[in-house]
Amino acid sequence: MTCMEFETLQKIIAEVLDVEEDEITMDTRLLEDLGADSLDAVEIIMGIEDELGITVPQEELESRNLATVGDVYELINDTMA
């Protein structure tokens, strides 16, 4: 499989959190910088799954610290590998 484009992740996060795409970088913290909560995180993952036609294993979600956008990006690309 291929890697997810970062711009795709930016778009999904921007839509879920109602922020501008240019505010979102790999180092952006989901909670502190974007104000995301656990429900927002679920919506982001669901949006990614729908967009890419993948399923992120629950055990992967539970075992990773998804503090930054880069953490989410890495999780998705590992899932797609």
Walk through the language-model features, giving the residues of each.
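Two-component histidine kinase catalytic core, primarily the HATPase_c
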Residues: D40
